[in-house]
């Protein structure tokens, strides 16, 4: 296969027409993006200045407020005017207004470089003007709101301490006025005095309550002696004559101590009086407990049948030729209607003492009386 070479005419044509090759390469340049659009350099510059509405501006809230105030005609704006400027300048803030508007209010109130100026005409129109502090005019370097200088706070003297010679309401408050007190030489002027306060009420000095005087030592000794006497009366018993004498004697020394002692000594028993008056004396001893009941009596004294057996004479011996009847038969000498032996008189001193101490002895069951009753019933049956 033979190699083909270009003809001289073609090579010469390529060397003689370099400009035509450049013109052919120019259409290969990338076309401009549709976002930027054509229309000359002026259109591209305006598109670069307009921010993207979907992107948050890189400025702090302090910078946004300062920017709005500086670009206003009077160098001051109300809160609503600041809101309108930020929304018109940065469309990003058209949504979620509640969040960033609260931040704007907080920065206006807490930052010292913003000064509140009241409106003319009093309270007829709502809202106040906000302006920049002259000392903070250059807080942004050369108009660059992204870089903020550190500002030194202006020196403010600390509030003076309260002094007795100065009134809290100022000179107007000391004079009894009802207007707003101004800070002067006579007062601080922090508060406006109320209308109902008068100069006489503010200038009067009210005395402090005095502490009670201590009780003298002699009164303490008398109270201790009265407590000891009341303890002795309580130990003796409420019904003893010594207790009544002690209660009468307590009325004298206790009356000098206080009204409680006088009332208690007249109406309460000695034990209760002692609980109040025994300030310095020893504690009162409790009354002794009552004695325990005696144990059941083990028959130390003879019963009535014992006394009757001891006092009855021995039986008389039988006559000549008379035989003693058997145990189950009655004697002819003894009538059938013979009454049972009478009980012994209760005039014996031992029996009276036993019944007085133990009444249950008189009602105690005894086998002797059962035997006599059975014998009497047997005699009545035999007589029938």
UniProtKB/Swiss-Prot annotation:
DNA-binding region: 56-150
Protein modification: Sumoylated with SUMO1; sumoylation is required for transcriptional repression activity.
GO terms for MF: cysteine-type endopeptidase regulator activity involved in apoptotic process; DNA binding; DNA-binding transcription factor activity; DNA-binding transcription factor activity, RNA polymerase II-specific; RNA polymerase II cis-regulatory region sequence-specific DNA binding
Listed Gly residues bias regions: 35-46
Biased amino acid composition, Basic residues: 298-308
Pro residues bias spans: 283-297, 312-329
Crosslinked positions (Glycyl lysine isopeptide (Lys-Gly) (interchain with G-Cter in SUMO)): 25
BP GO annotations: anatomical structure morphogenesis; apoptotic DNA fragmentation; cell differentiation; extraocular skeletal muscle development; ovarian follicle development; positive regulation of apoptotic process; positive regulation of DNA-templated transcription
Key words, A-Z: Differentiation, DNA-binding, Isopeptide bond, Nucleus, Phosphoprotein, Transcription, Transcription regulation, Ubl conjugation
Gene3D superfamilies reported in the protein's UniProt record: Winged helix-like DNA-binding domain superfamily/Winged helix DNA-binding domain (1.10.10.10)
SUPFAM superfamilies documented for this protein: Winged helix' DNA-binding domain (SSF46785)
GO cellular component: nucleus
Stretches for region Disordered: 1-54, 277-350
InterPro entries to which the protein is assigned, alphabetical: FH_FOXL2 (IPR047515), Fork_head_dom (IPR001766), FOX_domain-containing (IPR050211), TF_fork_head_CS_1 (IPR018122), TF_fork_head_CS_2 (IPR030456), WH-like_DNA-bd_sf (IPR036388), WH_DNA-bd_sf (IPR036390)
Main location: nucleus
Compartment(s) of residence: Nucleus
Functional summary from the UniProt entry: Transcriptional regulator. Critical factor essential for ovary differentiation and maintenance, and repression of the genetic program for somatic testis determination. Prevents trans-differentiation of ovary to testis through transcriptional repression of the Sertoli cell-promoting gene SOX9. Has apoptotic activity in ovarian cells. Suppresses ESR1-mediated transcription of PTGS2/COX2 stimulated by tamoxifen. Activates SIRT1 transcription under cellular stress conditions. Activates transcription of OSR2. Is a regulator of CYP19 expression. Is a transcriptional repressor of STAR.
Record PANTHER family: FORKHEAD BOX PROTEIN, FORKHEAD BOX PROTEIN L2
Assembly and interaction partners: Interacts with ESR1. Interacts with UBE2I/UBC9. Interacts with SMAD3. Interacts with DDX20.
Protein name: Forkhead box protein L2
Underlying gene: FOXL2
